[in-house]
Amino acid sequence: MEYPPDHEKWCRVREMMERHDLDAVIARAPDNVLYLTNYWTMKGYDLAIFPREGDPTLLVIEPQFREAQRTAWNKDVRFFPFYHPKDPRPPMIRAVEMAVEVLKERNLTRRVGIELSQTSQICDRMVGEPTVYWQGFYDSFRAACKETIDAAPLLAQVRMLKTPQEIERMRLANELAAIGMEHARDNSKPGMKESEVAAMIEGHIHAVGVGYKGKVEMARAFTLVWSGPGIATFTATSHRPVIENEPTLVEIWVCADGYWTDLTKNLCPRSLSAKYNVLLDQLLKIFNDAIACVREGAALGDVDRIIRRGIDAAGYPGQPSHPVGHGVGARAHEPPYSHQAAAGTMQSGMVLAIEPGIYWEGGGGLRLEDNFLVTANGCEKLCSYPDDFRR
């Protein structure tokens, strides 16, 4: 279940560093640490020092040292104390101090990139406590280095194009999402609580996903589930019942060893009602029109324009209130973003989530969402679970 070093990825990062004359990049966001080293941090306290030349250095809390040595692509893995008998400060402060020492030791203090504008990040493996930055983090590197620049947008730019290994890992996450949805489709019943459907999906994916095909070490699913009149743009899963003859909508994120899906799938106990048949047909046409525009060289904003124009023509002007296109990879939401006012074109190797939605006043509606790999001649849908869930 160990992936070989992704040399194509490292070459892309180093080409970026060459263009921006960087000695090193410091990564703390768990998704950037994963991207650069293949180590998915357990607590989010760890740091990666990625030099333009030579082996990266990974700094991890002591209990994770052996795990990091096993999974990281780089050989230089060091630990800092998670608990120190003479130092009551939080362990992430020790990580920063150690990183500064490494920069000085390796003579990497001339021009360094740090994550100055990291607005979001993947969760760590324990999920519950997202790590954050603090002023001392920035001050420490600014004091130690002659010059620091913002590496967050530079890494985001590199990450937009997936390597073959990344695509393989995203396929596994999408396969697990389909397995979870098929399990829910076959076992959901009218009257069951939305939360029961959510638990069914999340538990099944975790049970099947850990060890899946001998390739996945950790798999988790995160869902929001709404049924019938409970369907809205974004609200919490509740104890509302699954409604017969109406869709139960599942916003489903699956993470397989740090690579994500962002999907919206549906199921319906029994046959779909007449009004929902009409809505589904409308939304499928809008969805397919948007998918048809996805190919290398197309404007990123086309997805947004086509979806909103189609929803307006269907009689729902101004909908939806949420974005309808974005990148997916080591985060469920990452650049590029498909926005009608934004520049940029689609490129082969991008993976885009496309998600049109129509919502009724007072409750109810429908959303479809899949992840698509952009190719020279079109795109490939990564999840096999059908969008026309009547079949």
Where are each of the predicted segments found?
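Active-site neighborhoods and metal-handling regions in enzymes and metal-associated proteins
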Residues: 1-391
